[in-house]
Amino acid sequence: MSHLEYFTGILAHLQIDKLLVMHKLFTYLCSALLLVTATSCEKKTEKLLLGGSGWNKIVIIDKNTKQVEWEHPLEKGWECNSAVATPDGNILFAYARGAKLIDRNHQEIWNIAAPDTCEMQTARVLPDGNYLLGWVGHPAVIMEVSPKGEILSRTEYETGIEHPHAQFRQLNKNARGNYLMPLFATSDVREISPRGEVVKITRLEGTPFTTLALANGNHWVACGDGHSLMEVNL
């Protein structure tokens, strides 16, 4: 074997060893990256947006630690029975005198006021990205609003309940495109069409506060002052 062949063989082995080392290093870095990613995923926690009648603030808390991470003060008389985080991270809430959309820096994006004799009680995000607002009164009014605050539709409905505060809190829209209106004073949930016509009335025990659609086609109905939760075919 010549000296040239000898040194060429050594260099070839060195290149192979170098590639093996680089491969091991690459594998290690990938493993470390996956570990960091997994660890980061483990640290992700659910947040809860909380508000309620008689409380002077809206807060976001960490579900695990129970620590308040954000809060927005409410003025005296601002009864907040409906608050929700929008897909873009803003906060939409009803406060009796109207409904506001604010950002996390507490800056008002828009405000829709309710008439003096009415109370805005519903502020929800719809599956299509628009918002559902509703105020109690004579008549009660249901509105669909764009994220920019543009009123897209307006439905009026007379509940037959004299005192507006005894009408409803949280409206929802069902898969048929109608509105579910849980009424306190009459202890029933009414399905109202966008034209303001009654489609169906479901009578319940208790004071229905809100509804939530289930995968099986039924709905949860939470009864506020009735302190109960029931599954109902609405």
Predicted regions and their residues:
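Short hydrophobic targeting helices and cationic amphipathic motifs
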Residues: 4-7, 11-14
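Sec-dependent signal peptide recognition
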Residues: 7, 23-31
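Short, linear, compositionally biased motifs with a strong N-terminal bias
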Residues: 13, 31-32
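Bacterial Sec-dependent signal peptides at the C-terminal "C-region" and cleavage site
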Residues: 35-45
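Secretory-pathway ectodomains
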Residues: 44-234
